[in-house]
Amino acid sequence: MSAMSAPSDELVVIGKIVSVHGVRGDVKVYSFTDPIDNLLDYRRWTLRRGDEVKQVELVKGRLQGKILVASLKGLTDREVARTYADFEICVPRSELPALDDGEYYWYQLQGLKVLNQAGQLLGQVDHLLETGANDVLVVKPCAGSLDDRERLLPYTDHCVLKVDLDSGEMQVDWDADF
């Protein structure tokens, strides 16, 4: 394991170390990938917590309920493993699989300005939530927004009409009064 600096804009967060598991230095990981165990396809992780950055290598991992248990190269002590809690697990964007047209990674949607069909700026995508039925866009007010309300919009074909990454905008079918 080594310390390094990596431009954070080239990295995508795919999970987070939440705690230690067992006595041999394994860690419990919350995965942001779908399916959950896709995170285990990436063998080299960049760990990030605040300004602290480390490179680690995944030796093995397994799904245990809704959490992953991972063994990292050189990490064999429970107390040392405990210090890894709250590190985000990142990989370079270039390692993510290509998507079909009209499909987007969540990180690509974050920061997009959201306009309704009347051209009203509702806000900016802050983050997304996974609800089970469909993902939900959390749209927070930004400079030039119609008002200062936070909105929750379903990320569905019916609601999201167009995504334009180049212009940094998303058009939605959404009444400003909702």
UniProtKB/Swiss-Prot annotation:
Annotated SUPFAM superfamilies? PRC-barrel domain, Translation proteins
In Swiss-Prot or TrEMBL terms, this protein is called: Ribosome maturation factor RimM
The highest taxon in the source lineage is Bacteria
Q: Where in the cell is it found?
A: Cytoplasm
Domains: what does the record tell us? The PRC barrel domain binds ribosomal protein uS19.
- For this protein, what is any one GO molecular function term? ribosome binding
Record has Chaperone as a keyword: yes
Quaternary data? Binds ribosomal protein uS19.
Q: Where are the transmembrane segments?
A: none
Q: Name one GO biological process term.
A: rRNA processing
A UniProt-annotated Pfam family: PRC_RimM
The record's principal subcellular location, in a coarse class, is: cytoplasm
What is the taxonomic lineage of the source species? Bacteria, Pseudomonadati, Pseudomonadota, Gammaproteobacteria, Pseudomonadales
UniProt xrefs under PANTHER family: RIBOSOME MATURATION FACTOR RIMM
Native species of this protein? Stutzerimonas stutzeri (strain A1501)
Q: Which family is it part of?
A: Belongs to the RimM family.
Which UniProt keywords are given for this protein, alphabetically ordered? Answer: Chaperone, Cytoplasm, Ribosome biogenesis, rRNA processing
Q: Which GO terms describe its cellular component?
A: cytoplasm; ribosome
Q: Where is the PRC barrel domain?
A: 101-178
Q: Does Electron transport show up as a keyword for this record? A: no
